[in-house]
Structure formats: C-alpha cells, structure tokens
Amino acid sequence: MNIPNHPETETLQLTKVLHALSDPLRLELVKQLAEAKEKTCSTCADVQVAKSTLSHHFKVLRESGIAQVRIEGKRRYYSLRAEDLEKAFPGLLEAVLNVDQDRW
C-alpha cells in the first residue's frame, strides 16, 4: 500500500499553498473540510466531478500541506491541517474561508 507523505509544518511553502487554493473546486473542498472533521471522496457527493478528478484535487491539497489523509482499509479520510497552516501562515486560512463564493 502506498502511504502518502505529508509535508512537515516547517517545510510548507506559501507558493504551493496558494497554488492549491487557486482552483475553485479545491477551494470548495477546503471549505467543506473546515466544516467537517473528515471527508472521503464519497462524502463529497455535492461536488459534480468524477471520483478520479476529486482524488487528484485531494492529492494537490495533501501535497501542498493543506490537507492530510488517514487510510483505513480501502477508504481515505481527508482532514484540514488548520493548526499547521495557522502556525506557518497566520491568518491565511481564516481569510480564505471568509471570502464570499462569488468572489472566487
């Protein structure tokens, strides 16, 4: 089984985080992760994209350090790394989450 790696808090790069947040679908996923403890691809039913596309976007969020994944059996549970993001980039996540969707 491929165990995903997560960047350490000290190695998070602002350019990678901002790139990950620049996509409207990933921004929506971040908002959903902020509202829920964990999400899986199947619990994002309101997002109208293929499962492979959704998996790709979660991978970008994970590799940038925004999200982390916990594997249990065949399921992958994603969660927001809010504390790590706040430590690395104070105020960034709060600012992003408070932007109206019509301004994305």
From Swiss-Prot:
Domain of life according to the entry: Bacteria
Keywords: DNA-binding, Repressor, Transcription, Transcription regulation
Domain HTH arsR-type residue range list: 6-100
DNA-binding region: 40-63
SMART domains xref list: HTH_ARSR
GO BP: regulation of DNA-templated transcription
GO molecular function list: DNA binding; DNA-binding transcription factor activity
Protein name: Uncharacterized HTH-type transcriptional regulator YczG
Organism: Bacillus subtilis (strain 168)
Gene that this polypeptide is encoded by: yczG
